[in-house]
Curated annotation (Swiss-Prot):
Annotated positions binding ATP: 76-84, 99
Residues involved in Ca(2+) 3 binding: 472, 474, 476, 478, 483
Documented activity regulation: Activated by calcium. Upon calcium binding to the EF-hand domains, the C-terminus of the junction domain (J domain) undergoes a conformational change which results in the dissociation of the pseudo-substrate inhibitory motif from the catalytic domain. This, in turn, may facilitate the autophosphorylation of the activation loop at Thr-234, which leads to the kinase activation. Intracellular calcium increase is triggered by xanthurenic acid (XA), a small mosquito molecule that induces the differentiation of specialized transmission stages, the gametocytes, into male and female gametes.
This protein's domain notes: The junction domain (J domain) is composed of 2 motifs that maintain the kinase inactive. The N-terminal autoinhibitory motif acts as a pseudosubstrate inhibiting the catalytic domain while the C-terminal motif binds the EF-hand domains.
Purpose: Calcium-dependent protein kinase which acts as a sensor and effector of intracellular Ca(2+) levels probably in part downstream of cGMP-activated PKG kinase. Plays a central role in the host erythrocytes and hepatocytes infection cycles, sexual reproduction and mosquito transmission of the parasite. During the liver stage, involved in sporozoite motility and thus in sporozoite invasion of host hepatocytes, probably together with CDPK1 and CDPK5. Involved in merosome egress from host hepatocytes, probably together with CDPK5.
Disordered: annotated segments: 1-36
Alphabetical UniProt keywords: ATP-binding, Calcium, Cell membrane, Cytoplasm, Developmental protein, Differentiation, Kinase, Lipoprotein, Magnesium, Membrane, Metal-binding, Myristate, Nucleotide-binding, Phosphoprotein, Repeat, Serine/threonine-protein kinase, Transferase
EC annotation from Swiss-Prot or TrEMBL: 2.7.11.1
Residue numbers binding Ca(2+) 4: 506, 508, 510, 512, 517
Disulfide bonds: none
Protein name: Calcium-dependent protein kinase 4
Enzyme class of the recorded protein, top EC level: transferase
Catalytic activity of the protein: L-seryl-[protein] + ATP = O-phospho-L-seryl-[protein] + ADP + H(+); L-threonyl-[protein] + ATP = O-phospho-L-threonyl-[protein] + ADP + H(+)
Length: 528
């Protein structure tokens, strides 16, 4: 450059050339900047649209104040760490069981870790037979865990009341427990404290007898290639391999075997006058069917117990194989779910019309479907889901959807004889692509509820307002780019990029979403 401008006579011309070069370079930089912004927008748009939605993403340690959000009605139970209070949501009128844990009793680091681990596990688990966590928050003195109200009491109390169960009832209960455990093990979660006290009955209805697995304080993630070593559990139900300090997820199956033995006989297989005696018998692993109660129990039922109580974990039956056991299939094959046809017709219509690529709308609907519905409102849909869930693992795969969809169409009265398999498979694939919100290849329970529930019921003003408040973290009356970024785990993305992503929802182009825009988005999606 110095050589080019060495002559005074050339200075003007060269200065002109230099300015042209600078201008050209500036344009290039400007174009590069625009290109970079465009790429960033495309990246966030792709990241946003490919976000995996699960109900657990809505459970955050929020700034809810108990007395502002809920009205305590009565104490349902007390424990060493706190109490469970029947409470009513002041905005929706829904009732919940809220576990209130005093921070005075959670001073040890291990206790707090156990509580937070339980919350994290419940956030990721989505199954009919596993306790549903709606909300988790804290104040200076307490932790609060908000869940459904289960009015049927503990399975333990039902055993005490009945003494023992008929085989068909025992099979229905153990099938549900195994369904929950199959789902947990598939998601690399082991419970480690299965017992009748940790299994609740959803309602007092003795015919349906829907169970819920609770208390995940001792639960943890596991790896199939690694053994666990912590010696934890309850004496009657603990597996011998846990006592030996080297075990895997099949410790849960041993506990299921003990529970089934108790359901059929009314007494535990490993008994003793104190905990030491019980543990010695567990360690020996010897039990007997030589009891009067077992004289009328079928060999097939005993066979399942034997396979569950195999001393060596490597040869112990898995949860999935136990679900497929001949005795369970035989005992539950004639279960009649008595599906309400109008509810069936409405759910099929809703599933067929659900087509959305708008991620925010999907997230809002998933929150409303999974967190703002009651047991009574979803009772018929639960029956439909269970009818479609052929292998009982609490998820619907493609094959189950194809078979179940045909059955439901027949129940609804449609003639499926003219529909070829290719047409049904195409429709099922469309459904799977639309409602598999976490993109794992299965339809989870909450996903099914979200797309099949009555839209008029779901989109009530009270529920819309509560859903809006979930996204509007600061209570400003508008959902900002930053609030969405936090919810979707994309906090490092600029607000300009979010405006591009949200342009189809943001009607007034202010870069935020107000309640009217939020409501219109959902109404448009649901054709309501």
């Amino acid at each position: 450059m110095g050589q080019e401008v060495s002559s005074v006579n050339n200075t003007k011309n060269e200065h002109h050339k230099t300015n042209k070069k600078s201008l050209k370079g500036g344009n290039e930089r400007h174009e590069m900047k625009e290109s970079s912004v465009g790429i960033s927008k495309k990246i966030v748009e792709n990241s946003f649209n490919n976000s995996k939605l699960r109900p657990g993403m809505f459970i955050q340690n929020s700034n809810v104040v108990f007395n502002e959000q809920y009205k305590g009605i009565k104490i349902l139970g007390k424990g060493s760490f706190g109490e469970v209070i029947l409470s009513r949501d002041k905005h929706t009128g829904h009732e919940y069981a809220i576990k209130v844990i005093s921070k005075k009793h959670v001073k040890r680091k291990t206790d707090k870790e156990s509580l937070l681990r339980e919350v994290e596990l419940l956030k990721m688990l989505d199954h009919i037979n596993i306790m549903k966590l709606y909300e988790f928050f804290e104040d200076n003195n307490y932790y609060y865990l908000v869940s459904d109200v289960y009015t049927g009491g503990e399975l333990f109390d039902e055993i005490i009341s009945r003494k023992r169960f008929y085989e068909i009832d025992a099979a229905r209960i153990i099938k549900q427990i195994l369904s929950g455990i199959t789902y947990m093990h598939k998601n690399n979660v082991v419970h480690r404290d299965l017992k009748p006290e940790n299994i609740l009955l959803e309602t007092k209805n003795k015919e349906d007898m829907i169970i819920k697995i609770i208390d995940f304080g001792l639960s943890t993630h596991f790896e199939y290639s690694k053994k666990m070593k912590d010696k934890i559990g309850t004496a009657y139900y603990i597996a011998p391999d846990v006592l030996h300090g080297t075990y895997d997820e099949k410790c849960d199956i041993w506990s299921c075997g003990v529970i089934l033995y108790i359901l059929l006989s009314g007494c535990p297989p490993f008994n003793g006058s104190n905990e030491y005696d019980i543990l010695k018998k567990v360690e020996a692993g010897k039990y007997t069917f030589d009891l009067p109660q077992f004289k009328k129990i079928s060999d097939k039922a005993k066979d399942l117990i034997k396979k569950m109580l195999m001393y060596t974990s490597a040869v112990r039956i898995s949860a999935r194989d136990a679900l497929e056991h001949e005795w369970i299939k035989m005992m539950t094959s004639k279960d009649n779910l008595n599906i309400d046809i109008p509810s069936l017709e409405l759910s099929i219509a809703n599933i067929r019309q659900f087509q959305s690529t708008q991620k925010l709308a999907q997230a809002a609907l998933l929150y409303m479907g999974s967190k703002l519905t009651t047991i009574d409102e979803t009772k018929e849909l639960t029956k439909i889901f269970k009818k479609m869930d052929k292998n009982g693992d609490g998820q619907l795969d493609r094959n189950e959807l194809i078979i179940g969809y045909k059955e439901l169409l027949k129940l609804k009265g449609e003639d499926t004889s003219d529909l070829d398999n290719a047409a049904i498979e195409y429709e099922v694939d469309q459904i799977l692509n639309s409602i598999d919100l976490d993109q794992n290849g299965y339809i989870e329970y909450s996903e099914f509820l979200t797309v099949s529930i009555d839209r008029k019921l779901l989109l009530s003003t009270e529920r819309l307002e509560k859903a809006f408040k979930l996204f509007d973290k600061d209570g400003s009356g508008k959902i900002s780019a930053n609030e969405l970024a936090q919810l979707f785990g994309l906090s490092d993305v600029s607000s300009e990029c979010w405006k591009t992503v949200l342009k189809e929802v943001d009607q007034n182009n202010d870069g935020e979403i107000d309640f009217k825009e939020f409501r219109d988005m959902l109404v448009k999606l649901c054709n309501y």
